[in-house]
């Protein structure tokens, strides 16, 4: 049993700083293995599937399609975006933040969180961000799809508790 999540895949070289500001990512559908009960097996299966996605053409192709969509009039944009949305249950994104705490105007920044953007009929967004040795999760839901988002959040906690027992 799987659900399809659209995940952004970084297209910039990791060993080189970006020459200009802005996003450079492609989107790829990741089948999330929700039917695997063992949390360790599930993590490794997600990692394996992500590795396959990063090693194929799909994220680069999606980047090109999104760039093309930006040049089209609204009906054309809607049609292209519909291709992505029709096969997607969720958007899941992971951002690696700094390993050490930042300072802003002399004050320490204790927590950082962001919210993934969802579009159209995609009713679930999960954002994951590491910062200074901690991980923050954000959950965004469409009430028609998930009227009780706290129940999903509680499951995050339960799954992490399972991992810490191993």
Give residue spans per PLM region:
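Hydrophobic "lid/gating" helix adjacent to the active-site nucleophile
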Residues: 1-16
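Short beta-strand/turn micro-motifs at beta-sheet edges
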Residues: 15-19, 124-127
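A structural signal for short secondary-structure junctions
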Residues: 1, 22, 83-86, 118-122, ...
């Amino acid at each position: 049993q799987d659900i399809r999540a659209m995940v952004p895949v970084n297209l910039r070289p990791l060993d080189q700083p970006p020459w200009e500001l802005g996003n450079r990512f492609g989107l790829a559908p990741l089948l999330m293995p929700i039917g695997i009960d063992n949390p360790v097996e599930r993590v490794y299966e997600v990692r394996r599937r992500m590795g396959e996605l990063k090693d194929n053409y799909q994220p680069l192709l999606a980047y090109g399609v999104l760039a093309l969509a930006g040049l089209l009039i609204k009906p054309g944009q809607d049609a292209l975006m519909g291709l992505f949305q029709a096969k997607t249950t969720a958007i899941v994104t992971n951002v690696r933040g700094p390993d050490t705490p930042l300072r802003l105007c002399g004050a320490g920044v204790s927590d950082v969180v962001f919210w993934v953007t969802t579009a159209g009929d995609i009713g679930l967004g999960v954002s994951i961000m590491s910062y200074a040795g901690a991980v923050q999760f954000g959950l965004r839901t469409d009430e028609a799809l998930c009227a009780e988002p706290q129940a999903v959040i509680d499951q995050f906690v339960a799954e992490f508790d399972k991992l810490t027992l191993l």
